[in-house]
Amino acid sequence: MPHSSLHPSIPQPRGLRAQKAALVLLSACLVALWGLGEPPDYTLKWLVLHLASQQMGLLIKGICSLAEELCHVHSRYHGSYWRAVRACLCSSMRCGALLLLSCYFYCSLPNMADLPFTWMLALLGLSQALNILLGLQGLAPAEVSAICEKRNFNVAHGLAWSYYIGYLRLILPGLPARIQIYNQFHNNTLQGAGSHRLHILFPLDCGVPDDLNVADPNIRFLHELPQQSADRAGIKGRVYTNSIYELLENGQRAGVCVLEYATPLQTLFAMSQDGRAGFSREDRLEQAKLFCRTLEDILANAPESQNNCRLIVYQEPAEGSSFSLSQEILQHLRQEEREVTMGSTETSVMPGSSVLSQEPELLISGLEKPLPLRSDVF
């Protein structure tokens, strides 16, 4: 099963398997019709009749929906009746063209069914009316989920973009400088590759306590990073702060990092607890996974997040499990150290013979002193 690199339970976007299955079904039906030995014009006649009935049914359904939307023209469509018509008959051009083509073939081919057109139209209207009244054509939950993901209608999509634009995009660019200032006054407490990043915890059950020590006694608050302030939405000097925690292993300090929960998960949890939101526990889990995946996609294309942020996604264990949040975080910190070590090892590998055979080229800087790795000195 395809999944995100963050956690095995986070799904990837849906693919084209439904279309592939439809293609297989199409091939099987064509073989079955060929095996039955019916004349091609007979098969085409009934196929056209069925397609015309489907498109006519969609047209009738759209007209019924339009009757409701016309009552909301000013509040939903800014007084434009044409926009209301387009909202109800969005694919009317395609359906209309197919309907005209079907009617042409229906009239030109012999009427083997010998059914009056008026009778079929009345029967179609009766069938569609029953479908609307009884809700027989409702979308399956998987279809609703696919539409929401494709059109970015999910709660998770809005939360992820809000979290990035309203928070991460503001604090991540200045995070290395704040860590450097902190180290100057605290004897380089934040050392190593993992210590120079913001680590964001993502419990998929959305259980976010306000005190990390409650989640795991081996996670202890140490200090706060120097504050960052910015003018936001009319608030002068809005303050952003981040906390530094030490991670204990066998009673000894095993790691130090900038750590916090993803605060939008609290929103998802609160929505699932409030009946007015109509948000079930299953919805919460699905939206939490989509939130992680969407934020991962956003950060992958955000230059300010490069090497400044790491997402730690985990599934809250069942009762009696030996899961330890501090060990999960330490595992990520150690993995980051290994990644840096492997990267430095690869860059120091002896070059091939083709490279050694080239003339050496000296790259000499005109500056007296080497520049630091920070980009804000320019």
From Swiss-Prot:
The main place the protein resides is endoplasmic reticulum
Residues reported to bind 3',3'-c-di-GMP: S162, Y167, R238, V239, Y240, T241, T263
> Tell me, how does this one assemble?
Homodimer; forms a homodimer in absence of cyclic nucleotide (c-di-GMP or cGAMP); 'Lys-63'-linked ubiquitination at Lys-150 is required for homodimerization. Homotetramer; in presence of cyclic nucleotide (c-di-GMP or cGAMP), forms tetramers and higher-order oligomers through side-by-side packing. Interacts (when phosphorylated) with IRF3; following activation and phosphorylation on the pLxIS motif by TBK1, recruits IRF3. Interacts with RIGI, MAVS and SSR2. Interacts with RNF5 and TRIM56. Interacts with TBK1; when homodimer, leading to subsequent production of IFN-beta.
- Catalytic reactions on record: H(+)(in) = H(+)(out)
Q: Which gene encodes it?
A: STING1
Domain remark from Swiss-Prot or TrEMBL:
In absence of cGAMP, the transmembrane and cytoplasmic regions interact to form an integrated, domain-swapped dimeric assembly. In absence of cyclic nucleotide (c-di-GMP or cGAMP), the protein is autoinhibited by an intramolecular interaction between the cyclic dinucleotide-binding domain (CBD) and the C-terminal tail (CTT). Following cGAMP-binding, the cyclic dinucleotide-binding domain (CBD) is closed, leading to a 180 degrees rotation of the CBD domain relative to the transmembrane domain.
- Described function: Facilitator of innate immune signaling that acts as a sensor of cytosolic DNA from bacteria and viruses and promotes the production of type I interferon (IFN-alpha and IFN-beta). Innate immune response is triggered in response to non-CpG double-stranded DNA from viruses and bacteria delivered to the cytoplasm. Acts by binding cyclic dinucleotides: recognizes and binds cyclic di-GMP (c-di-GMP), a second messenger produced by bacteria, cyclic UMP-AMP (2',3'-cUAMP), and cyclic GMP-AMP (cGAMP), a messenger produced by CGAS in response to DNA virus in the cytosol.
- Note down the stretches annotated as region Mediates interaction with ZDHHC1 and ZDHHC11: 1-190
Q: Which residues cross the membrane?
A: 18-34, 45-69, 92-106, 117-134
Q: Which residues bind 2',3'-cGAMP?
A: S162, Y167, R238, T263
The terms describing its cellular component in GO are: autophagosome; autophagosome membrane; cytoplasm; cytoplasmic vesicle; endoplasmic reticulum membrane; endoplasmic reticulum-Golgi intermediate compartment membrane; Golgi membrane; mitochondrial outer membrane
Protein name, as recorded: Stimulator of interferon genes protein
